[in-house]
Design a protein with these regions (language model features):
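Catalytic palm subdomain of template-directed nucleic-acid polymerases
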Residues: 1-24, 40-46, 76-81
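Short secondary-structure boundary/capping segments
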Residues: 18, 46-47, 52-53, 134-135, ...
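Secondary-structure transition/capping motifs at alpha-helix termini
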Residues: 21-28, 153
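Short, conserved micro-motifs composed of acidic
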Residues: 28-66
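Non-catalytic, peripheral interaction segments enriched in hydrophobic/basic residues
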Residues: 30-35, 39-42, 67-196
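Short, intrinsically disordered, charge-balanced linker/junction segments flanking boundaries
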Residues: 116, 201-204
Length: 204
C-alpha cells in the first residue's frame, strides 16, 4: 500500500483513514515495516521547511527514510534514479558471475541464450529519467565487462566487433527497447487512469 499526499496534514489524514478502515476489519498495520518519505521539490528555493512533524499510524511514529525499495525499484527522496541503477548493476554482476561459474564450458549458442535471458533485462530501466551520467557510464562498462568475461573475449578486444559477432544488443539499445516497450504497453492499458496519466506526462 502506497499513500501519496501534497502536504503533511493530508498524509496524516490518509493514515488515519487507513487505520480506521483496518480497525473495522479487526486487523492492524505492521508499523515496524511502514515507512514515510518526503520528496524534495525540483526547485529547492520553494522548499517550505527542512523539518516536518513525525507521521503516526496507530499511535506509532513512522520512520523517515531517504530511499526505499518498493516492488523491486529503489525510490529516492531526491527522485533520482542513481541508487536503482547501482542496484541493477550489482544484480547484473551477480547473475553474470553465476553464468560464468556454471556455464563457462557451454557452446556459444547456449551461452547466447543464457545471456539474453538473464543479463539483458534491467528491471525498471524504462523508468530511469534523472541520474548522473557517470552512474550510467559505469553500468554500461559493467555490461561490456560481463559480456567479455562470459564469452572469453580479451579485455582490449573491440567492443563494436564483439557485439557484431555475438549479435547481442548494445547497452543503449537495451534501454531504448525497454522504454519503447513500456510506453507501448501503458498507452493501451485497460486502466483508464493509467492511460490518462500517460497522456498528461507525454503531452504536458
Amino acid at each position: 500500500l502506497v499513500l501519496l499526499a501534497p502536504s503533511w496534514l493530508a498524509q496524516q489524514k490518509l493514515l488515519n483513514i487507513c487505520a480506521a478502515a483496518v480497525a473495522d476489519l479487526d486487523t492492524n498495520f505492521n508499523t515496524s515495516k511502514s515507512y514515510t518519505m518526503i520528496f524534495e521539490p525540483f526547485n529547492r528555493t520553494r522548499r517550505v521547511t527542512f523539518e516536518f512533524p513525525s507521521l503516526a499510524l496507530n499511535a506509532s511514529q513512522l520512520c523517515v527514510v531517504s530511499s526505499f525499495m518498493y516492488l523491486g525499484h529503489i525510490l529516492s527522496a531526491s527522485t533520482a534514479d542513481n541508487d536503482d541503477i547501482a542496484h541493477q548493476m550489482s544484480l547484473l554482476y551477480a547473475r553474470a558471475n553465476v553464468l560464468i561459474r556454471k556455464f563457462s564450458k557451454c557452446s556459444r549458442n547456449v551461452k547466447l541464450c543464457l545471456f539474453r535471458t538473464y543479463c539483458t533485462n534491467f528491471y525498471g530501466a524504462a523508468l530511469w529519467k534523472q541520474y548522473n551520467a557517470t552512474v550510467l557510464k559505469r553500468f554500461k562498462a559493467a555490461y561490456v565487462k560481463c559480456v567479455k568475461m562470459f564469452f572469453g573475449y580479451d579485455r582490449m578486444y573491440s567492443v563494436t566487433a564483439m557485439f557484431i559477432e555475438l549479435g547481442l544488443p548494445v547497452f543503449s539499445t537495451i534501454l531504448h527497447n525497454a522504454k519503447c516497450s513500456f510506453v507501448a504497453s501503458i498507452s493501451v492499458h485497460a486502466n483508464s487512469v493509467v492511460r490518462v496519466v500517460h497522456a498528461v506526462c507525454a503531452y504536458p
